Amino acid sequence: MKKINPTQTSAWKALQQHFKEIEPIHIRHLFHADPKRSEKFSLTFNDLIRVDFSKNRLTAQTIEKLQALAQETDLALAICSMFSGGKINETEERPVLHIALRNRGNQPILVDGQDVMPLVNAVLEKMKRFCHQVIKGDWNGYSGQTITDVVNIGIGGSDLGPYMATEALKPYKNHLKMHFVSNVDGTDIVETLKALNPARTLFIVASKTFTTQETMTNAQTAREWFLKTAGDSAHVARHFVALSTNIKEVTNFGIDPENSFEFWDWVGGRYSLWSAIGLPIALSIGFDNFEKLLEGAYEMDQHFLKTDFTHNIPVILALIGIWYSHFFGAETEAVLPYDQYLHRFPAYLQQASMESNGKWVDRDGKPVGYQTGSILWGEPGTNGQHAFYQLIHQGTKIIPCDFIAPVISHNAIGDHHHKLLANFFAQTQALAFGKTEQEVQEELMAEGVFSEKATYLAPFKAFSGNRPTNSILLKQITPLSLGALIALYEHKIFTQGVILNIFSFDQWGVELGKKLASGILSELEGPEKVSCHDSSTNSLINCFKKWH
């Protein structure tokens, strides 16, 4: 990928000038000036997803100038490089090929001259056979009983993606009960194991190296718990499978190498749910539905690869994000799913975005002089409305929001879904258009409030509006549409990283704390006071040793 400082481009300078013209304009005015604004600023993907970005502080000219920035930073070349297996993860000298994992067209994708698709397809076929065995009851535990519960032990991308997707696709789940353990805090695994029967529980240990501290600590605890009942360590092979490439350590643990599912170093953890890491998803919803998840992502991949930037949904959403973070000074963005099944979607995107683009040096290794990754957060609606929407509506910070909702609910009970979606539509309208003090005064007086009190209350009850949102409607949450939605955000994140001249596919920021923790671990044993760190860390460690 080229190494272009976006702030030095002519497109960036044009956007700076354009911002001065746009900044004072209210969204209310933009709609009044163009009755067809929504039609012009909406895109539909495969009759599955509709994205309305009309309630933003931008014009057609803004989009044109943002697209010029994408062109000047050579986004098109970067996209082609990723899809063709170029080693765009330069600091680790690796390609970035999560797109190969869902390459349903089976086009050859080369890494160092070798087509990776036969490897990908072989692992998928192995996953398919295993899932059918477990789901149909042909895979029995040591006592001859079938499996009823599956515990996924992983962390980061080995947990967030599978957990999010199994929750989102609960309407498609079978009889298997899914559990996820990630935190090294013993409470996590202890509470999970309390209600489980060792003879009917299958553990998935997800660690590429099979050395990840948190994952292997939890896996060893699970193994000890299992053997208290099973007794014979040979039984581990029927109750533990691995998602790993370290066959030696997998075998040492007691797992049959035949029950280890491979993935590759060109798959980043936060982009790995499409790989063997997605085994818990496939076990939960069945392999046919897992393939539909891959199909939805593949269709979005093709849209991203082949669609002109003017109609390219991931590119447009990425550019809008840059518009707010780098010109309006927005520091956070909220993802607000109006569907309880998507309750873990913001947490999943939080890792995908912040671990990818939370970088302080550019692709030349020099400190950037501009913002990179935004802080991403969110909660399901309508819960959030009774928690933090106050600040979004009337606070002093600009917080761009993505509102996400399905048109068709999987649980059409009474008028629940109509009330939910009424709130969805109302919130984006209120954020965009607000309510003036004059409108508040007139309403209050119409309700019988005296003029003096109405004047007093008006500033507190007024809404400035002009708060930006994107509305993303899914026809329904299905494996196909969820796959497309996840891939949409993946490509949005990639696009922003390209334009901002940073590497989105490494994560060196997680290493220092892990290394320090490894050294501190041995210091927590014994009565000796610790004095080898800074005064604060020494004091905290010594307090722990005193109270423990």
UniProtKB/Swiss-Prot annotation:
GO molecular-function term, one example from the UniProt record: carbohydrate derivative binding
Coiled-coil region: none
One Pfam family of this chain: PGI
Localisation: Cytoplasm
NAD among keywords: no
Keywords: Cytoplasm, Gluconeogenesis, Glycolysis, Isomerase
GO cellular component annotations of the record: cytosol
Pathway: Carbohydrate biosynthesis; gluconeogenesis; Carbohydrate degradation; glycolysis; D-glyceraldehyde 3-phosphate and glycerone phosphate from D-glucose: step 2/4
Keyword Kinase: no
Stored Gene3D superfamilies: 1.10.1390.10, Glucose-6-phosphate isomerase like protein, domain 1 (3.40.50.10490)
InterPro entries assigned to the protein according to its UniProt record, in alphabetical order: G6P_Isomerase, G6P_Isomerase_C, Phosphoglucose_isomerase_CS, SIS_dom_sf, SIS_PGI_1, SIS_PGI_2
Catalysed conversion reaction: alpha-D-glucose 6-phosphate = beta-D-fructose 6-phosphate
Family that this chain belongs to: Belongs to the GPI family.
PANTHER family hit by this protein: GLUCOSE-6-PHOSPHATE ISOMERASE (PTHR11469:SF1)
Stated name of the protein: Glucose-6-phosphate isomerase
Classification lineage: Bacteria, Pseudomonadati, Pseudomonadota, Gammaproteobacteria, Enterobacterales
